[in-house]
Every structure is written in structure tokens, then in C-alpha cells.
Amino acid sequence: MSMDIKGNLTEIPLSENAILHQSGVSFFRIFTAYRKEKKIRTEKIVSGVISRRAFLDIEKGKSVLSRENWKFLMHRIGIVTDYFETVVSRKELKDWRCREDICLFVCEYCEKAKKLLEGYRNSHIKMSNIERQFCLKIEWLLSRDEKSGEELYKLSEDAVCCTVQEDWKENLSALYVGPEELEAMLLVVWSLLKKNELMDAFRLFDQIQRYPKIHNWEPRMREMICAQIALIGIKLYERMQKIDIAYKIGIESLELLRQQSSQRYVYPLLVELVRIGIMLEKEKSEELQQFLKFQKAFAILYEENKIPYMRVWQCGSIENSYDVGMVLKRMRMAQEKTQEEVCIDEKGFSFLNVRQLSRIEKGENRPSTENFQFLTRKMGRELDWIMPMLETDSIEVLSMRQDIIYAIGMRQWKKAKNILEQLKTKIRAEDYKEPQIQQEIQFIEAASLLEAQEISIEEAQDRYFQALSCTFSLEWLSQKELPFIKREEGIIISNIANLYRKIGKQEEAQGIFKRLYEVYEQQQRFLKINFPACVVALGQYSGLLGDRKEYAYALEIDTINLFCELNDFYLMSVGELLYNQAWDIYESDHIKNKKQYQKKFLCAQQFAYFNQDQDCIHFLKVREEKYLK
């Protein structure tokens, strides 16, 4: 029997980390530990981005590190930002969305991209170095067929020098740069090719290509730059009449993208591999035929979802970032409190006036760190601007956690369990009982046991409730509106709802799914991407709607889910979402809609092959007779 979610408010244990909670304390502890381990001076990391003095003020909590600066600095020391959740201002999210729109149009709709770039520049008179670098890279791409090689060379150099102040042409390996900066350097290589300065282009390209390996970037970091390196490398080696090497680096890049389930620049890379493969007389090879199938599947998917085939990608992801105004408003609404009530402290004094809170909730202002933390604590949560997924100082532990999440996404349960056992040995004894660490361990162990059919659905649900209660009051589940929910909490809540569905409690399941989606819907519509918990919840909710024979609504949910997934670079769920669409269409009218569901099913198969998702490949194989014959 499942745990009573209407029980007493769960006491969430406050760790020492939480008691000492200051702005960014967890992040800076991790950042400093990693920097010292690698023997990197702070000045080397922050150079060209922010001053040493400004960084010290941020460390002391006197000011807040912007999301862009934080991401940029993390990338410079080779750490992906997926290991953290961030609470950011509405302006930062709007700026990201503006840049994303420019990125979408720059390759296929140049005039529209030019207008958007001009608008972005006009609205950002005082640009940061990072923003200026972005704009110059876009300007280079928009003018590459209009300007001379010399003009493009100057433009690309200027882009690099926005953030790189040291000698980067001769001694790149000694510097700490991120994928964003390597991209700008690749434009310098492209410019040198346009100037016919082949050897200079090769010398710089060779340094860029070797940089990720020299600095021991993990695959998740290399994924952000591998395709760009390959595409420029193909141009370079083709000019040097070494197309076999061009083909090889393209293959290596594609393999890394497939291992990471990433679509970052994959379509232009497939186009180039097919073109060069034909030049090498490989057109009849099984490998090239598979590339053609991938290319066709991507083309169908992009066409149906009105997404450009060719686009630019921003480095990193924004899927773990939350709008501070939406966070505070959701928490207040969940507690059914007025703005006046939350602006008063325990002694009855007003620490914030209603007008200020109203502007914060509307996204017009960002609260001070003190007010943000006071408000969130008052409403039952311990939040910070930057929060690691687990209470640890170890990047290795956070990386292993991400490996577990990926393995679970691929339904590789034995692998996930093995990594979890290794992770336990890496966690310090004093950290082992931390709420998020316990939550992660309990949830993964319960999910693994359920998958192996070693526990019943009811027992698994009880364990999910127990895992959730490590950080989240179970009483909140019975409220009219859910409060702000962190990534892992959302995934656990969705799985709880899905187990209600499996034991036939459809009303309970639907109620949770609907309220959970409401948490993410507003920001999903604004950013046009999914949150990890959102893609899980919508996928499982679609299954419930299918059980209820609400096929049209299920298809609508799956279409929204797929579109938002395609707007980010991770493709892990795409094969499953395409199959969901095929199932919706088949069940609604399998005679009338035959062409539609077959097209979806065939695409799903190609994406399962692309992701090397053996479980999904097998799942679809046994259903071929139903959908294809």
C-alpha cells in the first residue's frame, strides 16, 4: 500500500551546507577544489571575462555571478554545467532566447538573422565580452560570402580577442579556454583558408583539434566542439587533398555525437560525410548507406517540426535553469499566500514591500541574494542561485551521477546499478546522509529493483515516496498547486504518478501529471525547450491518455514534447517520442493514417540506431509487423 501523501509535513533535515547557505557557497567550494586540484590560478580562468576583484566580490557574496559568466568559466576548466541547477533572472533567460532565435536563422534565413542581431545589439548597448564575442561570430557567418578573406580574418580575430587576452596563435595549449572560444578560433582557420594561407590554417587548426585531449575534457565537454572541429577540418584536409583524413575526423566526430545522443551540427556533418564518402567510392558501403538513412530521418523530423536543417548551437544547455520570478510566485501560490503575507518576517516586520515583490514575480527585477534566500526559506525551501545536483565537492561524483542518468535513459539498468555502487565508494562518509545523495541512491535502487521485478509496484511506489521525502514535503503533493520542484524531484513525482497508472488508479495519476506539467509549462512555452522532468512527465502522461483512449490529446502532448526536445541538442528521448506519435496515430485510425504512422515508426527506428539504444531497437523490431506490414 502506497504511503499516505496527506500525512504530516515531512521534516527536511538541514545539512551543515544548508545552515551555512550563502550565495553560491556550494558552487565556489567545488570550483575552488577543482581549480586547486588542477593547479590553475584564478587569474588564468577569469581573464577576459571578469576582473579578479569582481570575482572576489562574488566569492564573498557581495554580488551574483551571472549565468553566462558562470557557464563560460566552468567551460574554461572543462566542466559541463549539466551538473548544476541554477535560478536566474528573467532577463538572462530572455537574452538566451534572443540569441537562440538568431542561431536558428543564421544559416538558412540570413536577412531575418541580420535583423535579430541588429535588434540584440541595439538593446545591449553595454555588452559583456562574452556577448560581443557571440555577436562577432554571428556577424562573421552572415558576411562570409560578402567580405574578403582579409576582412573576415580581422573579424574572427576580434571575436577571439574579446575574451582571450594572451598569445593564442602559438601557445594555445597553455591557456584555459572554453568551446565558445575555440569556435571563434575555428573561424580564424576558415578565414585563413579563404585567404589561401593553408599552412597557417593547418598550424592553428592542429592546436585547436588537440586542445580538448591535452586538457582531458570528458566526452560531454568534447561534444560541444567536436562537430565544429570536424566541419572545418574537412574543409582544410580537402584543400590539402587528403580527403581520407577528412572522412576519418568526420567519422570520429559523428561517433562522439552518437555516444552523447547529440544532434549538435549533426545534419551538416552527415551531409559532408556522404559527400566525401562518395568521393572515396564508398557509396555502396553499409556505413554510408546508414549515414544516408540518418540524414533522411533528420530531414523528415526537421521538416515536420519546422526546424531549420542548418543552424548554430549555443554551448551548454539551459534546461536546468529556472526563472527566479516564476520560482517565487509558484511557491507563494502553492502556499495560498498573498504578497503581503510573504513580505513579513517572523517578527512581523516588512523586509520587502509588495510593489518590489510584484516586480520580481513579473520578471522586471531580480531580488537581492538576502531577500531571495529569506523568501525561499520562509516558504519551506533551501535554494541558491547555483546548486550542484548532489551535496559534494567532487566533480567526479557529479560526473558519475550524470553517467547513471544517461544509463537509465537508455534503460541500461545493470550499468546504472554498477556505476551507483562505484559512486557510493567515492562519496565522503560525512556526505553520505545528505538529503540529495540519499534521494538519488534510494530512487535509483528502487527503480532498478522494480525493473528486475524483485519488488512489487506498490513497494516501489512506497520507496519512491521515501526517496522524494528526503528533500520534498509529501504534504505538498496534496495541495492544489505544486511548489517549485527541482529536477530529480520532478522525475520521482512523475514516476510515482506512472505507478498509480500501472495499478489502475488513473484519476490519481492524471491529477499528479496535470499539476506537475503546470510547474513547467510557462517556462517551457517561453524557452521552447523541455526540462528533464518535463519530458519524462509528458511521455508518461501520454501513456495514461492512451490507456483512456484519448488519442488526439495524447498526440498533442507528444507533439509538444517532441518539438521542445528537438530545440535542445539531446536526442535521448526522440526515438521513444516518435514511437508514441506512431502509436497515437495508429490507434486513432490505422487504416486511414497508414502513411503517417509508418513514417513516424521508420524515423523512430533510425533515431534508435543513431543513439545506439539497443533496448529501443529491440522494442521497435518486435513491432515491425504491426506497423510496417
Regions found by a protein language model. Give the residues of each.
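A short, Lys/Arg-rich alpha-helix, primarily the initiator
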Residues: 2-37, 307-336
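Short alpha-helical DNA-recognition segment
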Residues: 38-57, 336-359
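DNA major-groove recognition helix of helix-turn-helix/homeodomain DNA-binding modules
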Residues: 68-83, 368-385, 629
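Flexible helix-coil transition and linker loops at the boundaries of alpha-helical arrays
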Residues: 83-87, 120-132, 161-178, 210-223, ...
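Structural signature of alpha-solenoid helical repeat junctions
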Residues: 92-93, 131, 173-180, 218-228, ...
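Tandem amphipathic alpha-helical repeat scaffolds
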Residues: 97-106, 134-148, 180-198, 225-239, ...
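Helix-turn-helix repeat elements of alpha-solenoid scaffolds
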Residues: 104-119, 145-169, 193-212, 240-252, ...
